[in-house]
Amino acid sequence: MDEAARVGEAGFDFAEINLLHPHQAFQEIPSLLRIKEQHKFFYLVHGPEEGSPFDCARLRASLLPQIKTLVAFASELEARIITAHFWLDERYIQPPVLREKLAILEEMLMLAREKQTAFCLENLSERACDFEPAFRHFPDLGMTLDIGHGELLSPENTAYRFIETFPDRIRHIHIHDNRGGNSPGDDLHLPLGEGSINFPPILSALVQSGYDGTITLEVPPHLFVQQREKLLTMLSSAQNRG
């Protein structure tokens, strides 16, 4: 809640609320609505951690109820987008598990449809080909493209192929820096420019694809304003190159 107020005071158009424990968040709704009205912005909502990505029984028993609560919370705030982690990397998850996960994902989407809220999956280590079955099965499934995650476990940032292959599915962007790597510990969430990600060509590809949606800076809160100016400069350059 404090971070939402800080985002509003800095003049941002929206705040993305990260809900690690959705069931505990409802008591904050009145305060969050006051902040929204005060600063005339809107909300996006980010869901809880998936837990074990291989245990479908646990996902049904634990994650699905959390997603149901998350959707209800987002609806109360009139949040425009819900983002969830739901790992679909075919290199590590066996086909029978992936098939069951698609069935679980369909149930998540049904919950979001009931509240008329856009539902997006965020890429972790996945490549574009890993999202293809989900996009093929579910025409209304969106994507939150995490450019920082795209730098991990890949010789080339996976954002390029996502933008090339599924530009119409990208509804939101997460941006932060890192130095590449092959483990969760390499997901450093550094300020832009403090890692090794080459942002200008990625942003140029994004601009050329026609994307004009929201971008969340996933960097330390005290750097929000400074990083916003840096990002706006890079986006302006990308538009000029386009």
Where are these regions (language model features)?
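Helix C-cap/helix->beta junction micro-motif
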Residues: E37-H39, L77, K115, S209-Y211
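Charged helix-capping and loop-helix junction motifs
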Residues: E28-L33, L59-K68, V97-E106, P155-E164, ...
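Hydrophobic faces of well-ordered beta-strands that scaffold small-molecule active sites
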Residues: A15-I17, Y43-G47, I82-A84, F119-L121, ...
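Active-site acidic/histidine proton-transfer and metal-coordination neighborhood
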Residues: C56-G142
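N-terminal pre-domain/capping segments
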Residues: M1-T69, S75, G142, N240-G242
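Alpha-helix-loop-beta-strand connector modules within alpha/beta enzyme cores
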Residues: L33-G51, L102-E114, F199-S204
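Histidine-acidic metal/acid-base catalytic patches
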Residues: D2-G8, E78, A128-A134, F138-L145, ...
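Acidic-and-aromatic substrate-binding clefts and catalytic sites of carbohydrate-active enzymes
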Residues: M1-D2, I17-S31, G51-A61, E90-I93, ...
